[in-house]
């Protein structure tokens, strides 16, 4: 609610008195009253007409059907007459509230007079003689401020309540025969029936969201007084709202019948599939044919979905294919782990004889292998071996591969399968074993250190056969005269003494006086006996 106390009374009085006044509101109330009277007159005329039909020459089933078809319209006329009369009363209430507010509001003339009197009292307030009248004038202005704010608050509350309680007029229902609802549908399912509290809640939400433009009657199965079957234009948004409500009610009916009578439930469902849903699909197709843009969008979505379906169908076809049968390989006889060298060339006579003479000390199976130098007989025609699709035969057993599965940079050499290679590997293993045995006998400590227990006197002279090197002396050039003022500078600079070793022991017999540079006078007296010229 607006905070009316925040504004002075001049603002409220000016806004309230400068408007069009209650004339427009009273005019609207008069129109609603005349509309209510017109509805009542039409209802009375229709009642007389229906009575005449029932009692006249049209008496019979046709007259009864005529009266039954006009019954919803007659009820709507009576309800509309009452609604219009109530709306007129609400407008009159708002007009009365406005008139009361104008009468209770302080006028601009009264407010101007209060301000004028206040200025005069303040101007003639000599020695405080107008203090009491000024206080009374200010109190009267505060009263008018409060009165204006309360008047506006009361007027707002009454007007908002009247507008909020004004009823809404529903659209007029069509005048149709009782069997007209079956023209579009060839089934007899009802969209009304036993309404639930949830249905009324949904109906109220629809009415609030649409601003009173969607009035669903769950008991009668109508939208804005029109049956669901009469909405046939799928291009209108209300068609989709009606279809959503219809499908939800159909599903609710199916579930209820499923627990009571499953046979009737499935019969109801098949009726929907055969008659109701195809009708709505035809309505959608008609709406799309009237809008080419919507038709293009719908066809695009359908084509994309069909493409996905065909793709899955192809995958399902692949699932039914049987893999090609691969002939089983002929079993290969197991070879011994260590093959003799003579088995590499069984078809060569001369090398085979030489190797046979060299392998004489070998075992009996090796000798029999060497002796069989003739080629092996061809395989039987019925046992077909595995064929290679290349003109060159694959490598034989023992052929090394050039590829390596190791992650190291060094490439592994193919392992030889000869006796010489086996002997070389055994020799390498023996050498490694002997090296490990020798390493075990050695002592290896990581914390050992060298003992320097030999005294050597340094020789600072030049090497034999070479000229002596000039010893290091202090330079006589540099920053100039340094020291205190009045002190004498020594020109003679002594040589560096170098490293000096002093004899002594650990019991206090060593030197106690620190060494000083050679340029210092060792015979110098105590500091108290120095000459005056040597100090600053």
Swiss-Prot record:
GO terms for biological process: response to host immune response. Residues 501-536 are annotated as: Disordered. Gene3D superfamilies: PPE superfamily. Residues 521-536 have a biased composition (Basic and acidic residues). It comes from the Bacteria. It holds the Pfam family PPE-PPW. Was identified as a high-confidence drug target. Belongs to the mycobacterial PPE family. This is Uncharacterized PPE family protein PPE3. It comes from Mycobacterium tuberculosis (strain ATCC 25618 / H37Rv).
């Amino acid at each position: 609610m607006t905070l009316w106390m925040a504004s002075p009374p001049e603002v409220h009085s000016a806004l309230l008195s400068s408007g069009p006044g209650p004339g427009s509101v009273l005019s609207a109330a008069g129109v609603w009253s005349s509309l209510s009277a017109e509805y009542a007159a039409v209802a009375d005329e229709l009642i007389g007409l229906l009575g005449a039909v029932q009692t006249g020459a049209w008496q019979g089933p046709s007259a009864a059907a005529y009266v039954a078809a006009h019954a919803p319209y007659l009820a709507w006329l009576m309800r509309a007459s009452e609604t219009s009369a109530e709306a007129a009363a609400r407008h009159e209430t708002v007009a009365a509230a406005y008139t009361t507010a104008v009468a209770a509001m302080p006028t601009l003339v009264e407010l101007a007079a209060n301000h004028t009197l206040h200025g005069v009292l303040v101007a003639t307030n000599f020695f405080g003689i107008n203090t009491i009248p000024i206080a009374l004038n200010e109190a009267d202005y505060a009263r008018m401020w409060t009165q204006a704010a309360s008047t506006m608050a009361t007027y707002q509350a009454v007007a908002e309540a009247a507008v909020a309680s004004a009823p809404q007029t529903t659209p007029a229902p069509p005048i149709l025969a009782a069997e007209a609802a079956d023209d579009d549908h060839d089934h007899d399912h009802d969209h009304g029936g036993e309404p639930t509290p949830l249905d009324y809640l949904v109906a109220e939400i629809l009415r609030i969201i649409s601003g009173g433009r969607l009035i669903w009657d769950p008991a009668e199965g109508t939208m804005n007084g029109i049956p669901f079957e009469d909405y046939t234009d799928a291009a209108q948004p209300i068609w989709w709202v009606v279809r959503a409500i219809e499908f939800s009610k159909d599903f609710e009916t199916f579930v209820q019948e499923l627990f009571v009578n499953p046979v009737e439930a499935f019969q109801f469902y098949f009726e929907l599939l055969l008659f109701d849903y195809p009708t709505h699909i035809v309505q959608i197709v008609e709406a799309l044919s009237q809008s080419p843009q919507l038709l293009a969008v719908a066809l695009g979505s359908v084509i994309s979905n069909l493409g996905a379906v065909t793709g899955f169908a192809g995958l399902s076809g692949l699932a039914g294919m049987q893999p090609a049968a691969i002939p089983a390989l002929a079993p290969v006889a197991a070879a011994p782990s260590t093959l003799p060298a003579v088995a590499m060339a069984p078809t060569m006579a001369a090398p085979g004889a030489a190797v046979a003479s060299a392998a004489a000390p070998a075992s009996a199976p090796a000798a029999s292998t060497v002796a069989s130098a003739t080629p092996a007989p061809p395989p039987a025609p019925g046992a077909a071996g595995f064929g290679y699709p290349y003109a060159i035969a694959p490598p034989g057993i023992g052929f090394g591969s050039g590829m390596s599965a190791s992650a190291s940079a060094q490439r592994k050499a193919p392992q030889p399968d000869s006796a010489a290679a086996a002997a070389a590997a055994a020799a390498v293993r023996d050498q490694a074993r002997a090296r490990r045995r020798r390493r075990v006998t050695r002592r290896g400590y990581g914390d050992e250190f060298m003992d320097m227990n030999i005294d050597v006197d340094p020789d600072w002279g030049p090497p034999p056969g070479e000229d002596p090197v000039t010893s290091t002396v202090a330079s006589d050039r540099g920053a100039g005269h340094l020291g205190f003022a009045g002190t004498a500078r020594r020109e003679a600079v002594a040589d560096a003494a170098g490293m000096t070793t002093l004899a002594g022991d650990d019991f206090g017999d060593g030197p106690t006086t620190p060494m000083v540079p050679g340029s210092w006078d060792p015979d110098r007296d105590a500091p108290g006996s120095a000459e005056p010229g040597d100090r600053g």
